[in-house]
């Protein structure tokens, strides 16, 4: 598998951004991938989440830092996971430019959905990203009228959805110490995150093979297990 750089971004805070970044990095470690975790969010929660790895069997496969440099493109790690700050500043823009995939977690509310148009347009025009490189992860969508409106906005905008993750009581929504995996998630709770990891890997492979249609890139299909 080629190196994959994933940035997790939304200009709106409190949408599950760091939780997704933490669990993606941990899944990669469990699958024996070398992981570089880059914490660009001043809150430092992404860094704090991995404190338990210092004395674990994963320590030889993992390192963390709080800066992003051009030389990271040549880093030996298999997965680079970047937790962006909740603002479209120069730090986030550099991460968006650097990443292969920009995962955008969204809740069924106006504030997490409103930046999508500007973000997509800027990423496409300024950094040459394709729509396929900016998948959404839906969090907490249900049968409510607000979720229906949010789904309509997503469909009308043509935004690809990588995964739809319900909120489970076993997963803290806002984490201060993100020891998610060590808490022992139930299999049902882990599944959507494992699906997201697999779909990202598959999407990157498809784009590398020249697939350009956004629906084909993110369609269900064979991928890394």
Range-by-range predicted roles:
Residues 25, 29-30, 96:
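Gly/Ala-rich phosphate-binding loop of Rossmann-like dinucleotide-binding domains
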Residues 9-15, 30-80, 86, 176:
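P-loop/Walker-type NTP enzyme "switch/lid" segment
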């Amino acid at each position: 598998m080629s190196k994959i750089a994933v940035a997790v971004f939304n200009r709106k805070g409190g949408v599950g951004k760091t939780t997704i970044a933490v669990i993606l990095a941990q899944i990669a470690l469990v699958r024996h991938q070398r992981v570089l975790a880059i914490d660009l969010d001043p809150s430092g929660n992404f860094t704090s989440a991995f404190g338990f790895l210092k004395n674990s069997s994963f320590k030889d496969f993992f390192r963390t830092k709080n800066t992003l440099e051009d030389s990271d493109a040549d880093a030996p790690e298999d997965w680079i996971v970047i937790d962006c700050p909740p603002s479209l500043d120069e730090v986030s823009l550099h991460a968006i430019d650097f990443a292969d995939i920009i995962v955008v977690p969204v809740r069924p509310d106006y504030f997490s959905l409103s930046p999508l148009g500007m973000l997509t347009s800027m990423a496409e025009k300024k950094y040459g990203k394709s729509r396929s490189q900016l998948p959404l992860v839906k969090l907490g969508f249900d049968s409510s009228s607000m979720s229906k409106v949010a789904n309509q906005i997503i469909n009308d905008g043509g935004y690809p959805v990588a995964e739809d993750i319900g909120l489970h009581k076993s997963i803290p929504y806002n984490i201060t110490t993100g020891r998610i995996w060590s808490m022992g998630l139930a299999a049902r709770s882990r599944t959507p995150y494992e699906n997201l990891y697999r779909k990202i890997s598959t999407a990157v492979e498809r784009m590398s093979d020249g697939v350009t249609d956004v629906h084909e890139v993110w369609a269900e299909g064979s991928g890394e297990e």
